Amino acid sequence: SCSCQKHFSCCD
């Protein structure tokens, strides 16, 4: 449940 964030690989 992650939005487009550059913290993790959520925003591929």
UniProtKB/Swiss-Prot annotation:
Keywords: Amidation, Disulfide bond, Secreted. Its main location: secreted. It is found in: Secreted. Expressed by the venom duct. The keyword Iron-sulfur does not apply. This is Conotoxin pc16c. The modification Aspartic acid 1-amide is found at D12. Coiled coil: none annotated. It comes from Conus pictus. Disulfide bonds join C2-C10, C4-C11. GO terms for cellular component: extracellular region. The cysteine framework is XVI (C-C-CC). It comes from the Eukaryota.
